[in-house]
């Protein structure tokens, strides 16, 4: 066990530092914002230092472990630890949260609460990615939902209460299945609950019971990922949310579902996962085609980007269910890649809204001449989203392809059919993304000039855009940076996959 509680500090620091915000004057908006940014940057630098000096990349085991008895009566432990799989999402969380806080224009209404909720969400996400205990995982899952609901319901569009209510109903419903699965695994074969991931991973279950547990966890993670048909909350939520909240939703929140699929469904329930994988691959392929076909019909800019997120999550599902080293590494790379690209697209959509006060694509047009910097960055990141070579999304989708082709689980004809349909989905992606660019930036201005503000990106917006664009290009040219974190852990997950 690690002698210094690094992970506990990373979990507690944002929410405890955020609690001090309520001591600030109510009208000190800039002070509150820069204080929040300071906490985010300090946390990110501290994580980078700790992981650089104390994390061994070639060790597939759980590192920086902490194991403290928290509640004596319930025999509940505070168990934290990270491996190569969780390291990437944790660093992504720190990076995107920092930029989302910087990206937000000054919030004039309840500024203290807004920034506190951003930091509380930060703590919940770090806690979830570093949890090594099923009950702690569930607590962090729920802790993260409360700030998201409040951010959605208090700041956003006219239908924000509807979208927030839809979000909480879907996610709370999924959480019931998550809790049932966690309690079922913990209480199986014992009168005392055993929530430790390591203990659960070494436990064998009757096939029918393992399938029952798997379905419960799958429903919870399918809502959050999202997986069709449990995705309908996502377009409404993104369509109404403040763009800083959208950055956190697209960049981090959706990745929690994919993380849970690997950490719990794949690691703890391998036999059930091998049974469900072919069916989930079919769902993933359908999701790519469905979302790519539905996206062009969306008038709302943020809803169109939201459907592109649903489509890209299909590649993650396929990579996870390929049950191959290459496929799972590709899924992890797609998690990181889409975290950057999705957050950036929603940020740029928000900057455009700040200027023209329009969200419907058929009311836009001709923005390229008056806002060339926004046009350039939006175009580059849209090309990254459609997997242009040299961008992170290209290698992520390509390696998922190779993972399916080289995997040993599926027959040749099945592989050919899956890759063909995936290729069709990739062909549809440029259609809705390039159409979106055409409607926004080309042609004549369709909106009223007196109500619009034709100034281009300022230093803050350029900094945020470039900060996200650099890792997208960097990973596109050197994907081994991400693979060096995950490859050993992926081998450990798959090493004895069918022999437990």
UniProtKB/Swiss-Prot annotation:
Keywords: Chloroplast, Membrane, NAD, NADP, Plastid, Plastoquinone, Quinone, Thylakoid, Translocase, Transmembrane, Transmembrane helix. It catalyses: a plastoquinone + NADH + (n+1) H(+)(in) = a plastoquinol + NAD(+) + n H(+)(out); a plastoquinone + NADPH + (n+1) H(+)(in) = a plastoquinol + NADP(+) + n H(+)(out). Pfam families: Proton_antipo_M. GO terms for biological process: ATP synthesis coupled electron transport. The chain crosses the membrane at residues 4-24, 31-51, 84-104, 111-129, 134-154, 167-187, 208-228, 242-262, 272-292, 305-325, 330-350, 386-406, 416-436, 463-483. GO terms for molecular function: NADH dehydrogenase (ubiquinone) activity; quinone binding. The keyword Hydrolase does not apply. The keyword Zinc does not apply. Its EC number is 7.1.1.-. GO terms for cellular component: chloroplast thylakoid membrane. PANTHER family: NAD(P)H-QUINONE OXIDOREDUCTASE CHAIN 4, CHLOROPLASTIC, NADH-UBIQUINONE OXIDOREDUCTASE CHAIN 4. This is NAD(P)H-quinone oxidoreductase chain 4, chloroplastic. It comes from Manihot esculenta (Cassava). The gene is ndhD.
């Amino acid at each position: 066990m690690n002698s210094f509680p690094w992970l506990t500090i990373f979990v507690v620091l944002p929410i405890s530092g955020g609690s001090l915000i309520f001591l600030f004057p109510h009208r000190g908006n800039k002070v509150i914002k820069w204080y929040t940014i300071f906490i985010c940057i300090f946390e990110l630098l501290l994580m980078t230092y700790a992981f650089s000096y104390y994390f061994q990349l070639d060790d597939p085991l759980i590192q920086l472990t902490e194991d403290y008895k928290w509640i004596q009566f319930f025999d509940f432990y505070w168990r934290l630890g990270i491996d190569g799989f969780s390291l990437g999402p944790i660093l992504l969380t720190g990076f995107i949260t920092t930029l989302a806080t910087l990206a937000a224009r000054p919030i004039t209404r309840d500024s203290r609460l807004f920034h506190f909720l951003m930091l509380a969400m930060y703590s919940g996400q770090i806690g979830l990615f570093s949890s090594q205990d099923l009950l702690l995982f569930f607590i962090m899952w729920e802790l993260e939902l409360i700030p998201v609901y409040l951010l959605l319901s208090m700041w956003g569009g006219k239908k924000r209460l509807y979208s927030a209510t839809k979000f909480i109903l879907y996610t709370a419903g999924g959480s019931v299945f998550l809790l049932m699965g966690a309690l079922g695994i913990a209480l199986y074969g014992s009168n005392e609950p055993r929530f430790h991931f390591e203990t659960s991973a070494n436990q064998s279950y009757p096939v029918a019971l393992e399938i029952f547990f798997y379905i419960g966890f799958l429903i919870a993670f399918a809502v959050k990922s999202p997986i069709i048909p449990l995705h309908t909350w996502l377009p409404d939520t993104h369509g109404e949310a403040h763009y800083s909240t959208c950055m956190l939703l697209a960049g981090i929140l959706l990745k929690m579902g994919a993380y849970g699929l690997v950490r719990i469904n794949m690691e703890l329930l391998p036999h059930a996962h091998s049974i469900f994988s072919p069916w989930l691959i079919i769902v993933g392929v359908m999701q790519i085609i469905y979302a790519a076909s539905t996206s062009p019909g969306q008038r709302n800019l943020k809803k169109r980007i939201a459907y592109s997120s649903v489509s890209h999550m299909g590649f993650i599902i396929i990579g996870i269910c390929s049950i191959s080293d290459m496929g799972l590494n590709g899924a992890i790379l797609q998690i990181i890649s889409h975290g950057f690209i999705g957050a950036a697209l929603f940020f740029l959509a928000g900057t455009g809204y700040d200027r023209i006060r329009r969200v419907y694509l058929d009311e836009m047009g001709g923005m390229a001449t008056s806002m060339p910097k926004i046009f350039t960055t939006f175009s580059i990141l849209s090309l990254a989203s459609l997997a242009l070579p040299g961008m992170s999304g290209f290698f992520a989708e390509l390696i998922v392809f190779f993972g399916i082709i080289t995997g040993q689980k599926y027959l040749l004809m099945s592989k050919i059919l899956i890759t063909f349909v995936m290729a069709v989905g990739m062909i549809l992606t440029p259609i809705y993304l390039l159409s979106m660019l055409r409607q926004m930036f080309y042609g004549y201005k369709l909106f009223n000039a007196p109500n619009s503000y034709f100034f281009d990106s300022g230093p803050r917006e350029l900094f945020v855009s470039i900060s996200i664009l650099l890792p997208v290009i960097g990973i596109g040219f050197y994907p081994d940076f991400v693979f060096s974190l995950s490859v050993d852990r992926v081998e450990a997950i798959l090493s004895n996959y069918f022999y437990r």
